[in-house]
């Protein structure tokens, strides 16, 4: 169903003013299926560590609640929609309750939600997004990069091109790459600037707070470990998963 048809149906049913509509996509384009995959001005594509893999458009409509025709430039993640939609439905404490453990509809849950309630930001009650950070996690569950405000630090780099991003490994960098996404949103300075390395050295201090945030984030995995391991095409990883599932046999 096209978006326009869905919006028209909501209006015909008298639900337009009482329905939140959010339109987005789960990841950046997959170029080898162009033109169906779309395109992006940002660097690289799905399954990389670059902005083209993670940064996507999002449109939200809630007549009378969210200001129309407004562009917001703060950091918002898809992880934020669960606590945001819960807040819209009247539950503003779901994140805190899940952290401690709670019962919902007769079922017990204890989960760590990384999302932020963006309701006040989307409605215009506050000017800044409550989210200052974003963790770039690949499909192997590796943290390949981190963002704090305008700064992005790349720990693992996928150097593949086109379908090669699926074949090439993520390379661990001894010295992470640094980008300022306000001044260099397309992450070109690394290759285009004659003075990138000098600029990097003058801003290496950025690594300290981001490494501290990364350590804090990773500590949450101790009390709230991942519930499952990601799938893999690599035979050694598949063998490891089978061995773990069989208790080492």
Cite the ranges covered by each PLM segment:
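Metal-dependent active-site segment of extracytoplasmic phospho-/sulfohydrolases and closely related
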Residues: 1-34
């Amino acid at each position: 169903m096209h978006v326009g048809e869905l919006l028209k149906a909501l209006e015909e049913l008298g639900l337009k003013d009482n329905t939140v509509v959010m339109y987005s996509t789960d990841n950046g384009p997959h170029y080898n299926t162009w033109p169906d995959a779309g395109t992006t001005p940002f660097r690289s594509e799905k399954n990389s560590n670059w902005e083209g893999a993670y940064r996507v458009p999002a449109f939200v409509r809630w007549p009378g609640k969210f200001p129309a025709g407004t562009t917001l430039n703060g950091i918002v993640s898809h992880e934020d929609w669960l606590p945001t939609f819960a807040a819209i439905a009247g539950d503003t404490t779901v994140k805190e309750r899940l952290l401690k453990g709670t019962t919902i509809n007769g079922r017990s849950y204890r989960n760590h939600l990384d999302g932020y309630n963006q309701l006040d930001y989307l409605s215009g009650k506050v000017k800044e997004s409550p989210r200052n950070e974003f963790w770039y996690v690949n499909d192997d569950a590796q943290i390949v990069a981190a963002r704090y405000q305008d700064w992005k630090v790349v720990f693992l780099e996928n150097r593949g091109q086109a379908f090669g991003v699926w074949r090439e490994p993520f390379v661990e960098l001894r010295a992470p790459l640094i980008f300022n996404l306000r001044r260099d949103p397309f992450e070109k300075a690394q290759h285009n600037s004659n003075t990138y390395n000098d600029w990097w050295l003058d801003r290496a201090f950025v690594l300290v707070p981001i490494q501290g945030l990364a350590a804090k984030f990773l500590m949450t995995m101790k009390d709230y470990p991942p519930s499952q391991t990601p799938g893999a095409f690599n035979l050694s990883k598949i063998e490891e998963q089978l061995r773990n599932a069989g208790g080492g046999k």
